[in-house]
Amino acid sequence: MKLPLLEEQNLKGKRVFVRVDFNVPVENGKATDRTRIEKTLPTLELLISKGAKIILGSHLGRPKGGPEPKYSMKPVFDVLSELVKTKVSFSESVIGSDVVKMTNALGEGEILLLENLRFHKEEEENVASFCKELAKLADVYVNDAFGTAHRAHASTEGVAHLLPAFAGLLMRKEIEVLSGLLAKPERPFVAIVGGSKVSSKFAILKNLLEKVDHLLIGGGMAYTFLKSRAVPVGKSLVEPEFESQAFQLIDRAGIQGVDLQIPVDHIIADAFDPNAKTKSVDKMGIIDGWMGMDIGPKTIDNYVKAIKDAKTILWNGPMGVFEMDKFSKGTIEIAKAISKSKAKTVVGGGDSIAAVNKAGVADKITHISTGGGASLEFLEGRTLPGVQCLLPKEEK
């Protein structure tokens, strides 16, 4: 996947519309986490150094197709003004002749932040006339919002067909890392997949089975696999409609020579509660009336052994109910093992990212993916509309 390089373009004096992902948590009119804003700074600094006139567009929250003050971009404007060493202006409108005038009046290296794009319902509907209005604001289009690349919205896909289009530095890094992971991983390639529901991860498991040497399964989804093999799972979370597919996936792994592992022991509880009674049980299964809440010590040892020998590691999803301290050990131990590995390590998914932060090892991970749903769809092997529209015509 070859993307044209933003660094090689002459952008002096040109108006550049950058689709960013500034969908940050806001409380009492203040942005409480500025990580997503900070991650776009390399792209913004590049554009400032090139003398571009920068127009930023993002969504925030889920407004219902019209202006809602609680979803205003103003708290983002306050943070952005602190973070960049240039003049930042704010437009209360997204489109229209007044906004076009504001874009033309920008000095080189200056920034104009637009109000929430989703205050127009046409944004999510990718309406052609709205795309044309957005295109009037700029001479060049840049998408630096990988987290929204799986959505074919006006600002993520539609407008890219109307202007010269490029990936921002953050977007390009995500695409390069995830593409490389799937195309030419150094072996052994170990994927660790967790989370509560097998239904939300089954497409990834199927795609990864064709590419990995070891597939380690944890979290609530593991109990559907265990049930499919007639292992007692008590009242653990099971999706009966996925039992036969889970059974077949284990069989297919055996035929293809992939080491697919499921938990051999468990930390169980008598209720889904941080104060529940707990026990450790082995592969004979989970007692009636109890539920699996985390992988057990033998499973941790097995998974850590596979991680130690790996050259490439992908981790998506926790090993247990790690937000409850009693059931966080499996997830934290996996995070620590990955951090000690000399392999190329990629971590994605909000819970896994929270786990590496909780374990204090985020700085030892090669790449932490900001993609969320976009990362999942990319790993499933699906085409992302927001990426497809950035490719040179011969690659589309």
From Swiss-Prot:
<keyword id="KW-0547">Nucleotide-binding</keyword>
<feature type="binding site">
    <location>
        <position position="118"/>
    </location>
    <ligand>
        <name>substrate</name>
    </ligand>
</feature>
<feature type="binding site">
    <location>
        <begin position="349"/>
        <end position="352"/>
    </location>
    <ligand>
        <name>ATP</name>
    </ligand>
</feature>
<feature type="binding site">
    <location>
        <begin position="21"/>
        <end position="23"/>
    </location>
    <ligand>
        <name>substrate</name>
    </ligand>
</feature>
<dbReference type="InterPro" id="IPR015824">
    <property type="entry name" value="Phosphoglycerate_kinase_N"/>
</dbReference>
<dbReference type="GO" id="GO:0006094">
    <property type="term" value="P:gluconeogenesis"/>
</dbReference>
<dbReference type="GO" id="GO:0043531">
    <property type="term" value="F:ADP binding"/>
</dbReference>
<dbReference type="GO" id="GO:0006096">
    <property type="term" value="P:glycolytic process"/>
</dbReference>
<feature type="binding site">
    <location>
        <position position="36"/>
    </location>
    <ligand>
        <name>substrate</name>
    </ligand>
</feature>
<comment type="subunit">
    <text>Monomer.</text>
</comment>
<comment type="pathway">
    <text>Carbohydrate degradation; glycolysis; pyruvate from D-glyceraldehyde 3-phosphate: step 2/5.</text>
</comment>
<keyword id="KW-0808">Transferase</keyword>
<keyword id="KW-0324">Glycolysis</keyword>
<keyword id="KW-0418">Kinase</keyword>
<dbReference type="GO" id="GO:0004618">
    <property type="term" value="F:phosphoglycerate kinase activity"/>
</dbReference>
<feature type="binding site">
    <location>
        <begin position="59"/>
        <end position="62"/>
    </location>
    <ligand>
        <name>substrate</name>
    </ligand>
</feature>
<feature type="binding site">
    <location>
        <position position="151"/>
    </location>
    <ligand>
        <name>substrate</name>
    </ligand>
</feature>
<dbReference type="InterPro" id="IPR036043">
    <property type="entry name" value="Phosphoglycerate_kinase_sf"/>
</dbReference>
<dbReference type="Pfam" id="PF00162">
    <property type="entry name" value="PGK"/>
</dbReference>
<dbReference type="GO" id="GO:0005829">
    <property type="term" value="C:cytosol"/>
</dbReference>
<feature type="binding site">
    <location>
        <position position="323"/>
    </location>
    <ligand>
        <name>ATP</name>
    </ligand>
</feature>
<keyword id="KW-0067">ATP-binding</keyword>
<keyword id="KW-0963">Cytoplasm</keyword>
<feature type="binding site">
    <location>
        <position position="201"/>
    </location>
    <ligand>
        <name>ATP</name>
    </ligand>
</feature>
<comment type="similarity">
    <text>Belongs to the phosphoglycerate kinase family.</text>
</comment>
<feature type="binding site">
    <location>
        <position position="292"/>
    </location>
    <ligand>
        <name>ATP</name>
    </ligand>
</feature>
<dbReference type="InterPro" id="IPR001576">
    <property type="entry name" value="Phosphoglycerate_kinase"/>
</dbReference>
<dbReference type="GO" id="GO:0005524">
    <property type="term" value="F:ATP binding"/>
</dbReference>
<protein>
    <recommendedName>
        <fullName>Phosphoglycerate kinase</fullName>
        <ecNumber>2.7.2.3</ecNumber>
    </recommendedName>
</protein>
<dbReference type="InterPro" id="IPR015911">
    <property type="entry name" value="Phosphoglycerate_kinase_CS"/>
</dbReference>
